[in-house]
Amino acid sequence: MSETPLEYRYRTLPREELTTRLAAVTLVAFDVDGTLTDGRIGFVGAGADRCLFFHTHDGHGIRNLREAGVSIAWVTANRFLGVTERAKSLRVLYLIQGRQDKKAAIEELGIPWQRIAYVGDDENDVPSMLAASVAFSPANATQPAAVASHVRLQLSGGNGAAREVCDLILRAKGLAPFVAPDGVVWRKP
């Protein structure tokens, strides 16, 4: 018996099931390169760390999720000082760098996969995506990651895809943005 080619294994969920799963999420695990960034890596000069760009909208979405009680993990096979600094500035709870087996790294956190949403864009994300309750892929994801996802996002990695995920989860939890005198807050309507 031959295996079905990956391109035919699209995973879809009915809207009600997707909303139920998103409402139950307690941890969102993000791949970094190509998901929180656009996937490009720049080199500024000799001995310099790599240059990565993160979108401010994504950062605000991550803060909103954290303030709503959802834990955040960043999981990357690389080690970049810029990733560490950005994660610290957003108070990311779990920063996992230098791990090729992202699924095993997430399992070490002890959180059941039924409570985890995963956002990935490439082949090394697929095992985590297949295990997660809900898997997202940015618009610019590779075909294997896109096929392994439940939700193909409208925005690209590093250009608002993470914010799109955050807003979907917050809405599934019954929260909506309100303009308050001191800024926008997410709360129950």
PLM feature spans:
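Feature captures the catalytic cores and cofactor-binding loops of soluble hydro-lyases/lyases
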Residues: 81-84, 99-105
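Short coil/turn segments at beta-strand junctions that form active-site/ligand-binding loops
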Residues: 24-26, 70, 114-115
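Basic, amphipathic juxtamembrane/active-site segments
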Residues: 40-63
